[in-house]
A protein has these predicted regions:
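Short, surface-exposed alpha-helix to beta-strand junction/turn motifs within ectodomains of secreted
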Residues: 56-66, 177-204, 284-299
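C-terminal beta-strand-rich structural cap/linker in extracellular carbohydrate-active enzymes
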Residues: 321-325, 859-884
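Carbohydrate-binding surface patches
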Residues: 270-284, 797-838
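The feature marks proteins involved in alpha-glucan
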Residues: 38-52, 78-168, 213-271, 275, ...
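Sec-dependent signal peptide cleavage junction
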Residues: 25-40
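Glycan-recognition and catalytic regions of carbohydrate-active enzymes
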Residues: 670-671, 728, 732-745, 757-824
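Substrate-binding/active-site clefts of carbohydrate-active enzymes
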Residues: 388-563, 573, 577, 581-592, ...
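Conserved alpha/beta catalytic core and glycan-binding cleft of carbohydrate-active enzymes
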Residues: 349, 354-356, 360, 585-586, ...
């Protein structure tokens, strides 16, 4: 047969014939295809969408009518959720299942079943917390996909309250290990008792009820509870559990009821009587216990009266000077004894408070209204010092070794006849001596004659001086008087005094006087009720709680007023909150705006919200508070986390930007050169060495073991010069200037005196570096260009120069900050060879700092616009062109202008009179 068709019709016919052949072949094969039912097997497909807030490891527990139970893991996933695919031999009419964990927590209370099968396949969709079994995706997705929280249901377990805590004065949060029926009516069978007396439950609510059951609820009572009594909760099937103090301590109702604004906490002494007041709002009874001797075991009890806002008071008639005392508190029927947190002095080892006459502890020469002159915060040059380190060396020339009184000794000299002690520090030129912890701390036995050592970052009694630094720790007045003598002596020598404070933690919350007086209030706790240790050194103080914050502020103000202190360094300040720090700044500024506040602004990962932490990131929210700049520290010498890590001065390239960030005082200088946002340069504390980690000299020994001491000395000088010429506040560890070593010990907090002492012989051995240091200090003090007060001033006057790799150079122009030098160039060369940099102009330049000498006197001059910077050296030059405005001191320049103006006025006046 012949057919004649068109081209398009031929193509259509071909497709049709192919389709017919394919369908025919499939039809021929159909009899050979078997369903799962025909194959003798049953396939189960379970799709499971867990609750969004559940991180439990769910699996399937399946059983047939033959009771062959077994666990099956989810072995796939799709858009709906997890998928479990299982094959069973034989045909099934019904399959039981539970969605559960290996600990037998179930997502619903009921056993459920798959009862619909299609050709040997049973496919269902399940939603966590929902008892319904869905046989289609459309049905399961209806009504949205928001899932309720899953109450963990346990099989064969005894009911118990796993959480019972007081969140408000009349509200208890509970959580149970197994679900209980919830009707949303009445008290749900829950019984609350206070010291055995049943309280009225107003209502019980829950946001996590599923099919009439829950494990979480909130109990609201008809009245506020007495926090000093034992509160319990129980329910049929759930044994009685004591309620702990939860968020109630942070609640507005608690603060309103118990915040005490008064200034008389602690003891108030007079010869006629001493008044005592302690804050213990959760106590049902409080007693004052007095002791005649520091080590008496039994004292005299006096019942205190309940005062306002959770305080307790008692007046003890007569002169109670040098009487020791504690408080006993009864909380939930248990008596506990504690030292007064506000005690101004304590017994030996700080186990009892002491009543002292503060006026009687003033030295014969005591000028609390007078301090060394100091106006601008960035005029500070801070010298960190440990009381014992200062004088304990046999070569120190000081008699009161390891004591406060060592700071009062004059004319001390070492074995080589060289100046030591306060005379030496004064001559060095620093402005502030920062004393490492001088409050009463644990871990040193004040009654032992054996040599003991600790840095002191484990506070015991915040408002009392450390007894091991006094000549008589048994007399509570002596430690106070001798510390005042030390402060006065330093002031008399033109040195201000800063105090290192540790309000972020105490060694142990359980042993602290805070927790004994008000359990659960002064420390931070995690969700399980465990006191947090966010520093790694002890339990964290909850400064965000009003009375804890009040204590810190009161304590700082007490030290500032009573001891006439000039600054405070806050250990691990990032654990404190912004509100606490800004309140301290406000209060101190009202007393004396020149008082320094600085702190470690590291983010320690606290329970505080990020924006609330007193960290570097939030520096712009804390004006007037300075933070340690670890960027320039690590940039100069290498990371402190790796002892062998190098930095700019000791051989690591591409660290220039870190150095530049420090040079500008951490301000927001440019897109690349910035640190903590829009801050003032006064907020950057620049340093390369402190008591933590290796000394700079020890670090250089570790990072550059093959270099000789001459090379390492150059590196050391280079590092010191970067710090002292940078904008901001320079900070040094005592002895850094004479290459202090701790023998490679990077954490000498409890090492012996041999490791920690200031070895005064090093001063003589390294007198060249000491003099170099002094010269840099003199340069900084006499030239305000290195101490600009604002970010805007720095951006206007400080420009970085184009430099080779491993070189940082910059120019300060325009008589910046009213400096007498019009143009200053500073350069740091970390290379092993000399480099040349191009200057902005050609003129006569005076060199005042090089790799060997430093100061304000001209070492030599050169002309031109090229500067050769020696290897591993710093250089500072200024425009020395003959110009009256740049060669004369600024005050003479000012006088000349005034004289000129006066002459002009007189001339014009005389001319006017002659014309008349």
């Amino acid at each position: 047969m012949n057919f004649k068709i068109g081209k398009n019709k031929s193509k259509t016919l071909s497709i049709f014939l192919v389709a017919v052949l394919v369908i025919t072949e499939l039809l021929l094969l159909m009899p050979n295809v078997k369903t799962f039912a025909q194959s003798g097997k049953t396939k189960i497909i379970i799709h499971y969408a867990k609750t969004p807030n559940s991180d439990l490891k769910w699996n399937m527990w399946l059983w047939t009518d033959k009771n062959d139970e077994s666990k099956f893991e989810f072995n796939g996933k799709d858009e709906f959720g997890k998928v479990c695919v299982v094959e069973f031999d034989g045909a099934l009419n019904k399959l039981g299942f539970i969605v559960r964990t290996d600990e037998w927590r179930k997502d619903t209370v009921d056993d459920r079943f798959i009862e619909k099968f299609n050709n040997g396949v049973g496919e269902v969709w399940l939603k966590g917390g929902d008892t319904k079994v869905y046989y289609s995706l459309a049905e399961a997705s209806a009504g949205g996909s928001k899932l309720a929280a899953v109450p963990p249901i346990a099989i064969g377990k005894t009911g118990e309250f796993i959480v019972a805590k007081l969140d408000e004065m009349n509200s208890i949060s509970i959580e149970t290990n197994i679900a209980f029926p919830f009707t949303a009516k009445g008290n749900e069978g829950i019984i609350v008792k206070s010291d055995g007396q049943i309280l009225t439950v107003k209502k019980v609510t829950s946001d996590e009820v599923i099919t009439g059951i829950t494990t979480v609820a909130k109990i609201e009572l008809s009245e506020n509870m007495n926090l000093g009594k034992k509160i319990t909760v129980s329910k049929l099937g759930f044994p009685e559990k004591e309620v702990v103090l939860g968020d109630v301590m942070k609640s507005a109702s608690f603060e309103k009821m118990f915040y005490y604004e008064g200034t008389d906490l602690g003891n108030t002494y007079s010869k006629g009587k001493t008044s005592f007041r302690v804050w213990a709002p959760t106590a049902t009874e409080v007693k004052l216990v007095t002791y005649k001797k520091w080590n008496d075991k039994i004292g005299v009890d006096s019942s205190m009266k309940k005062g306002e806002k959770g305080t307790w008071t008692f007046d003890l008639n007569g002169d109670q000077k040098d009487v020791f005392y504690t408080y006993k508190v009864n909380i939930k029927g248990v008596w506990t004894e504690a030292v007064d947190p506000y005690a101004r002095s304590v017994s030996a080892n700080g186990d009892k408070g002491a009543v002292i006459d503060l006026k009687g502890t003033d030295p014969e020469i005591w000028n609390p209204g007078e301090k060394p002159n100091f106006t601008n915060l960035n005029d500070a040059i801070i010298y960190e010092l440990h009381v014992r380190d200062f004088s304990i060396d046999k070569n120190s020339g000081m008699e009161n070794k390891g004591k406060f009184l060592a700071f009062t000794e004059k004319g001390t000299k070492g074995t080589e006849g060289k100046r030591t002690g306060v005379d030496y520090i004064k001559d060095l030129g620093v402005t502030h001596v920062e004393l490492m912890p001088i409050f009463d701390y644990a871990s040193v036995d004040e009654t032992s004659s054996k040599a003991q050592y600790n840095w002191g970052y484990n506070p015991k009694n915040y408002n009392a001086p450390e007894g091991s630094y006094s000549t008589d720790p048994y007399n509570p007045s002596v430690r106070v008087k001798e510390l005042k003598q030390a402060v006065q002596s330093l002031h008399d020598n033109g040195l201000r005094v800063n105090m290192d404070v540790v309000y972020n933690h105490m060694y142990s919350s359980n042993d602290s006087n805070f927790n004994k007086l008000v359990p659960g209030y002064y420390f931070r706790y995690d969700k399980d009720g465990t006191a947090t240790n966010e520093s790694g050194f002890g339990n964290t103080i909850a400064c965000e709680n009003a009375m804890a914050r009040k204590f810190i502020v009161d304590s700082v103000m007490y030290w500032a007023k009573e001891y006439n202190l000039d600054g405070f360094r806050f250990d691990l300040m990032g654990l404190l909150d912004i509100n606490t720090m800004t309140e301290i700044r406000k209060k101190l500024s009202s007393l004396d705006p020149s008082i320094l506040i600085m702190g470690e602004g590291l983010d320690m990962g606290t329970t505080l919200l990020s924006d609330a932490k007193a960290t570097q990131k939030n520096a712009s929210k804390m004006p007037g508070i300075s933070l340690f700049n670890d960027i320039i520290r690590d940039g100069i010498k290498g990371s402190v986390l790796d002892a062998k890590a190098k930095g700019f001065v000791n051989g690591k390239s591409y660290e220039e930007t870190k150095i530049e960030k420090g040079i500008v005082g951490g301000i927001d200088y440019s897109n690349d050169i910035k640190t903590w946002g829009k801050i003032s340069p006064l907020q950057s504390v620049n340093y390369v060495e402190t008591h933590d980690n290796n000394t700079l000299w020890d670090k250089l020994l570790l990072t550059n073991p093959k270099d000789d001491n001459e090379i390492r000395l150059k590196m050391h000088k280079l590092a010191d010069s970067i710090i002292l010429t940078s904008q901001g506040i320079p900070f040094f560890q005592a002895g850094q200037e004479f290459l202090r070593t701790k023998g490679g010990n990077s954490n000498s907090y409890k090492s012996n005196d041999a490791v920690n002492k200031l070895d005064w012989t090093l001063k003589s051995k390294n007198i060249d570096t000491v003099n170099y240091f002094k010269g840099l200090i003199k340069l900084r003090k006499e030239h305000p260009a290195f101490k600009m007060n604002s970010a805007e001033m720095i951006k206007q006057n400080l420009k970085f120069l184009k430099s080779p790799q491993n070189v940082v150079a910059y120019e300060i122009s325009h008589n910046a900050n009213m400096d007498t030098w019009s143009d200053i160039v500073v350069a740091f060369n970390a290379n092993r060879e000399d480099v040349t940099i191009k200057l902005s102009k050609s003129c006569t330049w005076n060199i005042v700092v090089d790799g060997e000498k430093s100061g304000v006197k001209t070492i030599k001059q050169f002309k031109g616009d090229s500067l050769v910077v020696p290897a591993l050296s710093s250089i500072v030059i200024y425009d020395g062109s003959e110009n009256i405005f740049t060669t004369l001191p600024f005050w003479i320049y000012t006088v000349l202008i005034l004289c000129g103006v006066t002459y002009l006025i007189l001339f014009l006046k005389g001319r006017k009179e002659s014309l008349e």
